[in-house]
């Protein structure tokens, strides 16, 4: 992610500050004070931030004919073992929050008579779990359970999951490399045994530039 005003510093991101009218977007972003779309809107930066969904959607849209839609639920500093736990969510209770967002967003499409197909689930998280010993050592097990519950709750047994690699090039990654590695190993273990889950290498683009941060990636 980066700030809209910084886009001009990074030519590959040129134009992402503008709305993508051909892409539908439903979202709930933040911790205590969430920013919600309250329905489907054009894909655009939220809170002056350029999220990964913007470049992702532009890339996909250039390579397929059908229109796409993205549902995003995100909050920084959350744990898979806690906030995102599908069985006993704590604190920000991200799993039930996201499930409700997905169901309400899809229901709105149904009401509008729009046909759709859920293509996949993108998951990029894990840094905060390394600070809790139990969460860190059980990350793979928790991720496997997380994936299983999503497939059950959406009634899509073969729902595809794309698990983004964690970056070890930032300050967190350098100082806490063994713990980051433990999380990554848990992710890799799941994708090696699940034919519908794929591990997506991203560390080659990991970077943190500027003071304050201009282009930021964990």
Question: Language-model features: where?
Answer:
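Cell-envelope and extracellular/periplasmic
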Residues: 1-218
């Amino acid at each position: 992610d980066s700030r809209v005003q910084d886009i001009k510093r990074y030519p590959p991101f040129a134009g992402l500050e503008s709305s993508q009218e051909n892409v539908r977007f439903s979202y709930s972003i933040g911790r205590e004070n969430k920013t919600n779309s309250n329905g489907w809107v054009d894909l655009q930066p939220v809170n002056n931030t350029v999220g990964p969904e913007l470049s992702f959607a532009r890339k996909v849209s250039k390579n397929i004919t059908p229109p796409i839609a993205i549902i995003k639920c995100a909050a920084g500093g959350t744990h898979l073992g806690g906030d995102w736990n599908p069985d006993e969510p704590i604190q920000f209770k991200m799993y039930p929050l996201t499930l409700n967002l997905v169901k309400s967003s899809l229901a709105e499409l149904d009401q509008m008579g729009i046909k759709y197909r859920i293509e996949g689930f993108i998951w990029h998280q894990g840094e905060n779990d390394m600070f809790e010993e139990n969460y860190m050592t059980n990350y793979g097990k928790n991720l496997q359970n997380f994936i299983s519950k999503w497939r059950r709750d959406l009634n899509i047994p073969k729902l595809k999951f794309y698990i983004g690699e964690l970056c070890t090039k930032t300050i967190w990654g350098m100082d806490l490399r063994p713990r980051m590695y433990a999380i990554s190993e848990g992710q890799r273990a799941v994708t090696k045994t699940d034919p519908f889950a794929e591990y997506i290498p991203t560390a080659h683009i990991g970077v943190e530039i500027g003071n304050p941060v201009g282009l930021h990636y964990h």
